Amino acid sequence: MTGVQTCALPIFYPSALADGGYDVDDYRNVDPKLGTLDDFDEMLAALHDAGIRVFVDIVPNHSSNLHQWFKDAIAAAPGSPERARYIFRDGRGENGELPPTDWPSHFAPSAWTHESVWGGTSNQWYMHWFAPEQPDWNWDNPEIEADFLHTLKFWADRGVDGFRIDVAHALKKDLSEPLRMRDTLEYDEPRNLEGTGILMDRNEVLEVYKTWRKLFNSYDPPRVAVAEANVQPSRMPLYASEETLGQAFDFRFIDAHFDAAIFKHCVQDSLALAKANNSSSTWTLGNHDQMRYATKQGLHPVVDRTEWLLSNGTSHPVDFQIGTQCSVAANLFILALPGCTYIYQGDELGLHEVADIPEDQIQDPVYLRNHKKAKGRDGCRVPLPWTRNGKNFGFGDGGVHLPQPEWFGSYSVEAQSGNDQTPLEIFRKALKLRKELQAAEELTWHHTTRDDVLHFSRPNGWNCITNFKGGKYPMPKGEILVASQPVVNGQIPAGTTVWFKA
C-alpha cells in the first residue's frame, strides 16, 4: 500500500476505444472486456474496506457514435427529438456539401462529420470537438441534463465517492445562427474572462454544475467532484466553488519547469484565487494526457517534446536520474501544500515516458489523425510494472494494451519495496505523514539565502524546504520527517525536498 486515500479510476465504460474509452457507448455499465457491474461492486467494496475512496470518470461533453441515442439520431429525421440530443446542422454550399463551419476538432481536420459516414441519409452534419466517433451532446436540451443526473445518481447510489468531470468547460456552446467562422472567434482555447465566449467556458455551464452540486450534497457524506477545466486561471475557482463542483485541477505545475520562481508564482496565484472565491486549491503534476513529469525534467528545457517522441526518444538524451529526482522532489513539494493533491499512477515509482512504442501498436488517435505529426499520449499510459520480471511485469495474466519496455523492471514495485531511498518508499512515508500532519489550509513563506531555494511552513510547525538547483544548501534546524534525497552532514542536495518539524 502507498497510503493513498482515494483511487480515481480511469475510464471503464463500454467503448470501441476510438479515444482510449472516452468514446462512451453506455454511461451506466462496465465494458465487458474489463468485467461486469458485479465485478465493479466487488472492487468498490474491497477498496472501501481498505479505507480508500473511489472516484469515477464522467464524460459529459460527448458520447460515442455507438451510443444508442446517437444511433437513434442517425436513423431519425432532421428536427426530430432524437436529433435534438446532439448538434446537427445543415451544411454550406449549394447542396450542403460543405461543413457548417470551418472549425477544426482536436483529433480531425473538421469539427463536423457528415451523417452519411454512419449511414444517415438526411444530408446533415454533426459536431464533435474530438474524434468523429465522439459526437457532442446538445446541452441546451433538458433531456441531456436529466440523463446525466440519472447517471451520477446511478454511480453515487452504488457507493462511488466522487467524480472527475472530463472537459468540464466545454458543455455549453452558443450555436445561434448564423454560425461564426473560425476567423471571427478565438478558437483554440478559451480566452474570454467574462464567461461569455462562444464555444467554451460559458457561464451557463456553471448552472449545470450547481444542479449537480445539489445532487452531490443530498448524500451523506456529500459526493466529491473535480473539474478538468482548461480555462484561464482566474476562471478556475468558479468550477471549484462549493456551489459548483468543489474542486478543479490546477494544471499550472504540469508544464512548469522545476524552478523556484515558477513554483512560488504558481502557488501564490492559486492560493490567492482560491481564497478570493472561497474554494480550495488542487495540485497535480501529471495525468493520462501528459508526458510523464520525470521525463520532462530529464530533458533539456529547449527540446521539442513532440519531435523527441516522434524520434522514439533518440533525438536528445534524457537524464533519467535527474528527471526522477526532480519528479520526487516536486511531488513532495505539492504534497505539503494546502489543498488536495492528485498523483498520476506511476509517479510514485518515478516512471518515465515510454517513447519507443512501435508504430503498429500506437493507439492514440492523435497520431494518425494528425498525419503522424504527433505521437500522442500512449507513452504515459503503459501498464505499471509490479514485478522485476515475469509476464507483463506482474500486470495480470492476459495481454497488455501497450508494450512495456525492458527497463520497466528496475522501476517496479518489487524492485523498490523495502529500500527507503526509492521513490515508492519515499511516497509511502510522505503520504502517511501527510495524513497525520493535516492542518488549516494556510502557509507561511520563510526567507532563504538563495533564490533557488523555497521554504514554507504550515500552521502546525510542518515545514517544507526545496533546493531546486545549484549547490548544496544548509538544512534548517529541526527534525527531518522525510526527504526526497539523503541530507548528509546537514546539507540539502540540489533537486531535493525535505519535510521537517521546527
Question: Which residues does each PLM region occupy?
Answer:
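Active-site and adjacent substrate-binding regions of carbohydrate-active enzymes
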Residues: M1-G478, V482-A502
